Amino acid sequence: MALDKTYPIFTVRWLAVHGLAVPTVFFLGSISAMQFIQR
């Protein structure tokens, strides 16, 4: 637990990347589903 000051920065950055990546994948999946429904 010596890296207690450096670790939260990496954790916040990791949470921000996943917080943006997960809705993006879900949004792309919904767009592809709507395109399959329209055709």
UniProtKB/Swiss-Prot annotation:
Biological processes per GO annotation: photosynthetic electron transport chain
Location within or outside the cell: Plastid, Chloroplast thylakoid membrane
Cofactor binding notes: With its partner (PsbE) binds heme. PSII binds additional chlorophylls, carotenoids and specific lipids.
PROSITE patterns in UniProt: CYTOCHROME_B559
The entry's keywords: Chloroplast, Electron transport, Heme, Iron, Membrane, Metal-binding, Photosynthesis, Photosystem II, Plastid, Thylakoid, Transmembrane, Transmembrane helix, Transport
GO CC entries: chloroplast thylakoid membrane; photosystem II reaction center
Cofactor: heme b
InterPro entries the UniProt entry points to: PSII_cyt_b559_bsu, PSII_cyt_b559_CS, PSII_cyt_b559_N
Main location: plastid
Transmembrane segments: 14-30
Membrane topology: Single-pass membrane protein
Binding residues for heme: 18
GO MF term (any one): iron ion binding
Subunit structure: Heterodimer of an alpha subunit and a beta subunit. PSII is composed of 1 copy each of membrane proteins PsbA, PsbB, PsbC, PsbD, PsbE, PsbF, PsbH, PsbI, PsbJ, PsbK, PsbL, PsbM, PsbT, PsbX, PsbY, PsbZ, Psb30/Ycf12, at least 3 peripheral proteins of the oxygen-evolving complex and a large number of cofactors. It forms dimeric complexes.
Role noted for this protein: This b-type cytochrome is tightly associated with the reaction center of photosystem II (PSII). PSII is a light-driven water:plastoquinone oxidoreductase that uses light energy to abstract electrons from H(2)O, generating O(2) and a proton gradient subsequently used for ATP formation. It consists of a core antenna complex that captures photons, and an electron transfer chain that converts photonic excitation into a charge separation.
Family statement drawn from the similarity comment of this UniProt entry: Belongs to the PsbE/PsbF family.
Record's protein name: Cytochrome b559 subunit beta
Organism (species): Adiantum capillus-veneris
